[in-house]
């Protein structure tokens, strides 16, 4: 998401995004101390990450296909489990990764000495193993390269359109 906003609006939009994201990290908790301000920060962060999370999931599916990984299973798990998280954005890419790697992610978690029941993402086809880390990194790097290529193509298209439009679209004034 930070790179998305940097590409979209340069350093200013990148800093605005980072401020929203940091605010959510610092006060976006569901407790009395930060109930209202924290909720606003969390909702703003959810809104800011809505499009980048979904674009990233699509880029991960594309990268899996190019890298010869099981992109179809990644897509299947994405459509099934993409909402299996309290955050509307967190499970988007996690679901693709779980499907591509044929593992189950998330589930119950311990926070401050208390276990919280949470939904799982993916099918429990095999246990997660150390070799999954380089596979997940390969998928992530592939998605990053796909994002960079997409950004270059979009920016080149915008620049090309701007140049074509510059001459005929520029009004000419006649002194009269």
Q: Model segments located where?
A:
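Hydrophobic alpha-helical transmembrane segments
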Residues: 1-23, 28-176
């Amino acid at each position: 998401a930070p790179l998305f906003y940097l590409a979209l609006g340069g350093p200013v939009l990148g800093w605005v995004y980072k401020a929203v994201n940091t605010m959510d990290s610092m006060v976006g908790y569901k407790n009395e101390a930060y109930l209202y301000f924290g909720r606003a920060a969390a909702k703003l962060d959810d809104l800011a990450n809505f499009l980048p999370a979904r674009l990233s999931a699509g880029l991960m599916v594309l990268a899996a296909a190019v890298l010869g990984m099981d992109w179809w299973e990644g897509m299947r798990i994405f459509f099934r489990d993409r909402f299996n998280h309290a955050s509307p954005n967190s499970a988007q890419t996690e679901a693709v990764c779980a499907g591509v790697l044929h593992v189950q992610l998330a589930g119950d978690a311990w926070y401050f000495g208390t276990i919280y029941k949470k939904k799982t993402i993916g099918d429990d086809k095999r246990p997660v193993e150390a070799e999954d880390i380089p596979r997940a990194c390969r998928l992530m790097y592939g998605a990053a390269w796909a994002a960079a290529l997409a950004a270059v193509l979009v920016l080149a298209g915008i620049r090309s359109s701007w140049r074509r439009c510059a001459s005929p679209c520029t009004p000419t004034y006649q002194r009269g």
